[in-house]
A protein has these predicted regions:
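Extracellular/periplasmic helix-loop-helix junction of adjacent transmembrane segments
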Residues: 7-8, 27-65
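Small-residue-rich segments within alpha-helical transmembrane domains of MFS-like 12-TM solute carriers
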Residues: 23-26, 114-122, 148, 152
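Intracellular juxtamembrane helix-capping segments at the cytosolic ends
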Residues: 35, 117-140
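Transmembrane alpha-helical cores of Major Facilitator Superfamily
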Residues: 54-61, 111, 141-149
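A gly/Pro-rich, aromatic-decorated transmembrane alpha-helix motif that marks the paired
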Residues: 68-69, 123, 140-175
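Hydrophobic core of transmembrane alpha-helices in multi-pass small-molecule transporters
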Residues: 93, 104-120
Length: 185
């Protein structure tokens, strides 16, 4: 049987890892224009660049709404089930965004991202506090590093390596050309 110290360290590493995934919504600030360009060229020609800018605030707002729901689910069903739900919703988000070029369908994916963020964010923090009751601030800080570190890692990868490696400029209408915008998928 692993000791409490080993369980605490494993729980902290798991919480940090989950927040490395959940922090991906901050990356939308970087890729909004690419996403709008993708929709413009593929299925939603009348979309405006500004239409994509509601995504990140919406995900954050839904996350805040689902923080308390996630804690209630954790209290009733446990942290594993809560994190399973969080992982399931983020998986559904990625699948919807990968296989749909319809803006209205993608909105469901963004809703799922907010739900995932809300369910997973506080439940792992609360779980780690059981192992570190005298260091709650320290533990919370380590876990939340993952949230911010996600965009710190993903933004340059998305912008400079995957989507627009040559750093081409937008066309006169504000959108990127079809070759660049299709790199988002």
């Amino acid at each position: 049987m692993p000791s409490q110290k080993v369980k605490g360290i494993c729980t902290l590493i798991g919480a940090l890892s989950l927040n490395l995934i959940l922090g991906n919504h901050y990356t939308w600030a970087c890729i909004n224009v690419y996403y709008a360009s993708y929709l413009h060229h593929n299925d939603t020609p009348n979309i405006k660049i500004q239409d994509a800018y509601f995504i990140m605030p919406s995900i954050i707002l839904l996350g805040y709404i689902f923080f308390t729901i996630g804690v209630k689910i954790q209290d009733k069903f446990g942290v594993r089930f809560t994190n399973f739900l969080s992982g399931l919703f983020i998986l559904l988000t990625f699948l919807i965004l990968k296989y749909s070029s319809k803006f209205k369908i993608n909105i469901i994916g963004f809703i799922f991202a907010g739900i995932s963020n809300g369910l997973g964010y506080l439940s792992v923090i609360k779980n780690c506090w059981k192992y570190y009751p005298n260091n709650k601030g320290w533990v919370t800080g380590i876990i939340l590093i993952g949230h911010g570190l996600c965009s710190f890692i993903l933004n340059p990868i998305a912008d400079f390596i995957l989507i627009n490696p040559n750093q081409e400029k937008t066309e006169s209408n504000g959108f990127y050309n079809k070759n660049i915008s299709n790199n988002i998928i």
